[in-house]
Design a protein with these regions (language model features):
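N-terminal accessory segments
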Residues: 1-111
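Conserved class I S-adenosyl-L-methionine
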Residues: 159-169
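Conserved SAM-binding loop of SAM-dependent methyltransferases across substrates and taxa
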Residues: 170-182
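A short acidic, Gly/Pro-enriched loop at the edge of an enzyme's catalytic core
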Residues: 219-230
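A short SAM/SAH-binding and catalytic strip from SAM-dependent methyltransferases
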Residues: 228-242
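A short glycine-rich, Lys/Arg-flanked "PGG" loop and its adjoining helix->strand segment in the class I
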Residues: 243-255
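Conserved beta-strand signature within the Rossmann-like core of class I S-adenosyl-L-methionine
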Residues: 256-264
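Short, glycine-/aromatic-enriched active-site segment of Class I SAM-dependent methyltransferases
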Residues: 266-285
Length: 323
């Protein structure tokens, strides 16, 4: 039986999100956010771009309602448009945190799911050679979509002096932790081919006085001094490797030092984005991955106490334990 009054709200919402995505892609192709870091009329923008003024007005109005552009009315009744703070920081080519256009090409989620249906999970072995410059830069952009921001916002490092960031990769977590906590100094430990990117970012963000880098892995790492915090972000999908890593991390810590464990889990929160994250990760490896309890149990089993949840969002949890 057909109920014609049953509206396809969920379907329409998804299709409308896709429209917003396409609008965002067009605005990036035009480099609008760099051009309107200062207020500009649609007419002036039309002249510089060679694009129809009315089209640009409608585009800017759509971007204004999305929250990426601010409209300012002048005393003469005309409108000027300026990039909103979030667009200036992440979508302007002049920003250090510019996300680039690659993030906004056709996403890999569809390709990933299609490949899983046709071929099953990837059997690729993640060895040290996997961690190329390209992969590290890709993870850097992904981290800027919320991972770094939420970690810096929710992880409390007040009073801590020395942070060890194992597998710190691009280095953004340590760079911005030390920017928030001026007395904190960080040491990033990662593979030799990865730290090329790490050092570039340390220089880019002028963090050389706060962040050091060591080439190597945690198996052979022999620090001369203890740390009072260790940060681990998605460093391993293996339960055995996780326990080994936590055991080693404990030896690197001074008494009452803390380990901060940030990881994807299949039961982070009950929102749609966590469900999407879980689906993607299963399609990538054919394994369900960690649950929250796996992390807290691993922390307790390796001698950490005061195990607490710090933050949960979009398939990720941050938990903390004390030596």
């Amino acid at each position: 039986m057909i109920d014609i009054e049953l509206e396809p709200d969920a379907i329409r919402l998804i299709l409308n999100y896709r429209k917003l995505f396409e609008i965002l892609k067009v605005s990036l192709d035009l480099d609008i956010y760099t051009r309107i870091t200062s207020p500009l009329t649609a007419r002036h923008l039309s002249r510089s771009l060679g694009v129809d003024e009315r089209f640009l007005t409608y585009l800017l109005e759509a971007l204004q309602r999305i929250g990426l552009v601010i409209r300012v009315e002048s005393d003469q009744g005309s409108s000027t448009y300026q990039s909103a703070a979030v667009a200036r920081q992440y979508l302007s080519r002049e920003s250090l945190l510019y996300l680039g256009q690659e993030q906004f090409q056709d996403g890999e989620t569809g390709k990933l799911l299609e490949r899983y249906i046709k071929e099953g999970p990837s059997n690729e072995v993640i060895s040290a050679d996997y961690w190329t410059r390209e992969i590290t830069k890709k993870l850097e952009l992904v981290a800027l979509l919320g991972g770094v921001q939420s970690a810096v916002k929710h992880v409390n490092l007040a009073g801590r002096k020395r942070l060890l960031d194992i597998g710190g990769g691009h280095g953004l977590y340590s760079i911005f932790f030390t920017r928030k906590y001026p007395e904190l100094r960080a040491c990033i430990l990662d593979l030799p081919q990865v730290i090329e990117v790490t050092n570039e970012n340390i220089k880019r963000y002028n963090a050389g006085e706060r962040v050091d880098v060591v080439a190597g892995d945690f198996h052979a790492f022999r620090p001369t001094r203890k740390f009072d915090a260790v940060f681990l972000s998605n460093v391993t999908p293996s339960p055995d490797e996780l326990r080994l890593l936590l055991t080693k991390s404990r030896t690197f810590l001074s008494e009452r030092g803390i380990v901060i464990l940030r990881s994807f889990v299949s039961d982070s929160t009950l929102d749609v984005w966590s469900a999407v994250s879980t689906l993607e990760r299963y399609a990538r490896r054919g394994r369900p991955g960690f649950k929250r309890a796996d992390l807290t149990t691993a922390l307790r089993d390796t001698g950490f106490s005061d195990v607490t949840d710090v933050h949960s969002a979009e398939g990720v949890v941050i938990v903390c334990g004390t030596k």
